[in-house]
């Protein structure tokens, strides 16, 4: 690989010298913040927590592969191939939330602001409420993704040929949103008006929830593995191309009939995106190890990490937007204080 070549943007600003390099020493699949501590989720067994200037502290959470993880800033919830759902809080305390009775793999996890946790094993989605009441729902095929709605206790369960919307506290039959194909990651817009899935094919699909009108977002050269809502939820940033693709969601029709913005193009595929919590800025990671910060209004770029390494697996901002963490698949990682 060659050194980073900004092409026409030869005057690109670099902050690479301000990045604190971290050697996690193991493959990384995700990163989240617990308060001001960056927590790098390993592919196997452990989470590596970095607090202040200290070296990464290893916390054992599973007896095998870590298949999924999510966080609300107060705790990280993970699912593993040991059939367990585990929580790690900011104090470093590990607690078991659930163990699948059949020891099936825990493929997906989701967190609700009120403390409810959802997870899936095979074709079954589970919810444990804040009062420890557990409920389950079977869907036609293996669950591909889970997401809680921002308002009310409603869970979106993505699977083959559509998404099931489940109100676990209501007796009504779950609502089914149909669209042919395999639906994986799923996300509600912050204003609760839209639902979007990343599909097994190189495309996104969406529904306007007021009338279930379809929204088709295509044109990707590869599968979309990372999506992030902008601050305020007016746009959706996505990986899957050699630029960050941002779909507009400011109007009542969402992206229907509109072209997406294309930011930070490189000669490498975008593998991870993370939007700043308050400002119109995003971080983008690429398959060649590059990390950029991008101002969404005009596309201005700042180089955070040069290429020449493994693909970027994960990016995360802390809640204040003052720290950016990134990690490559091979465990090379970094922290940037803004």
Positions of predicted regions on the chain:
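WD40-repeat beta-propeller superdomains and closely related acidic/aromatic-rich repeat-like regions
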Residues: 1-338
